Amino acid sequence: MVATSRNQLNSYFVSEMEALRSNASQFGEKYPNIASELALSNGRSRDPHVEHLLQSFAWMHSRLRLMVESESSKLATILLQQFYPQLVASTPSMSIAEFEVDGFAANFGDGYLLPGGSLMEPVNLLSTNEASSDYGKCRFSTCYDTLLWPLEVLSVKKELSSQYPELETRFSRVQSVLKIELGESQPGAAENLDFGNPVRFFIDVDEEYRFLFLEILYRHLIGVAVLDHEGKIRKILDRGAFKVNGFDDDERIFPRDSKQELGLTLLHDYFTFPEKFLFFELRGLESLAVATKEEEVKEFASFALVLNEKLPEKIPLNHRSIKLNCAPVTNLFQKTSEPIPVNNKEFRHKLAMDRQKPDDYEIYRVEKVFSIDSRGQQRELVPYFSPALSENVEDKYGWISQFEESYHRKNQGNDVWLSFFNADHERDAPTSETIFAKTICCNNSLCESMPVGQEFALIGSGPLNSIKLVSRPSRYRKSSLGEERQWQLLSHLSLYHVALSEPNTARDSLRQALDLYVNQEDLVGQRQIESIEQLDAEEGVAPSKIGGWRGYYRGTKYTLVLNERKFEGSPTLFGSVLNQYLALFSHINSFSSLELKLGNERVFKWQPMTGHKILA
């Protein structure tokens, strides 16, 4: 899609040319002697030099007009950069990676922790198109900490509940059982595992059934059984042993900022990369005795997921339908900008990551800015909005980064400019010094054409044999820096002064808020928002035992009604995200709760929450 600002500049240029030619025609009619000499009487000059002057003037005036109008949106953009930078920055490509571990290369007692932000580079390039030669510049990083295990899924099977009499005795409503059989990735690799942490799985069924499968687990899972390698039930646990991932504060896709509210971050994650929520974890393997095997067998243990609904036959299942050792990865990485000499001739300075190939990199966020003097002394410059700038220190400079649409790139993208101010809030810069910045970058749209199965290698050490993409990278999306959208986003973030309790406006208010997070090309997201038929809110009370205090909280109970025919995806997942968002509207010593309905059918009811904590 062509960038909005370029379209706007073209529109301004056309209007300026039409105005010039129209006025020229009128001028020629009024002053034929002068106009005939200039050949303007027909509104379009036959003299190429005159036409060149007209077009040059129209371009200069339209560009000036665009710059003046863009100034009015800078305040909103700068404020958004401070509080919610992910709403201003472009959205990089994201994917799901599968890690093949070496079970004897590390201590896997409670799982090996692969830190968030671990970098990966592509190897053994598969694609043969023109872009494949540049894939080597791409870098992906893990979004958050991931536990790896020397295990693999051997089989995923639907089984009859009659095969497990113990489960039928424990759960009266059991209808079917989903058995996930685990095996050692290497013989003997699982002998010293303690399983002090839960085991996390990724749902990798056929794309059209992924969210249906998640919906079934969400709504119909009532218990979990743990079986040993011989198939004997060792533990029977309730639904609490099962958890859908992606909702915790430390499970954000994009680099977090302490100022970002979790509810708004989840909305952004959901509408940009919903596959992030296709993870679930199971507890119960802790203290499981691993029998000594007389011969090498790969089977280790199994999970039996107890469901009160039969699994649809149309969902094909095999040993690759559910995977271990997977994690979301994003095309974000740290990179240092090229040095920029500072002088008094320019009031702002453009950051460049690679002057030879500027299209290969785009800045997602500026982390730190440094300056170096002629003696090689380096110092860090503080952000303009930092309290440190107000300290009475000589030669103290503050910096502000501004995102603007690039007119020089072949591909869509933004440029980043740095402006400097002194402690008196006047434009000033560390002249005769050289500046550079530590940034978080992406590769623009380069990674989105990578194929499924592309191999990667970890940059650094780790007990990994290989890394592969199990899903095609999502599309890169350039941020919208239009004036109207920026002010809409900023006003939306003032949600604490907005009420959703008005029955006549609650549904429309919620729809308008969600529209700000959905890309116009995301038809599924658009249909999900359009499926919201009703949002009701009423006052209520809920018991609480937080901190040993027993009593009642006052709060708001929301009821969300969706149109089942319009909605596409997992309604319960959608409701879980909205439940966290609605929690932002609760005040101190109050709660919020959500009940989800599809038409007249009650689907799910979440426990009351105060902030993002469930009331005990």
Regions found by a protein language model. Give the residues of each.
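Extended assembly-interface regions of large multimeric machines
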Residues: 1-230, 236
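Mixed-charge (acidic/basic) macromolecular-recognition segments
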Residues: 1-34, 38-41, 236-295, 479-518
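C-terminal domain/tail detector
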Residues: 2, 372-616
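Extended alpha-helical scaffold and adjacent linker segments that couple domains
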Residues: 5, 88, 96-100, 106, ...
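Short, Φ-rich (hydrophobic/aromatic) sequence segments
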Residues: 53-57, 79, 217, 326-328, ...
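Extracellular ectodomain segments of secreted/surface proteins
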Residues: 61-69, 86, 162-196, 318-320, ...
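Residues at beta-strand starts and edge strands
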Residues: 93-95, 174-178, 195-197, 220, ...
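Short, low-complexity Pro/Thr/Gly
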Residues: 187-396
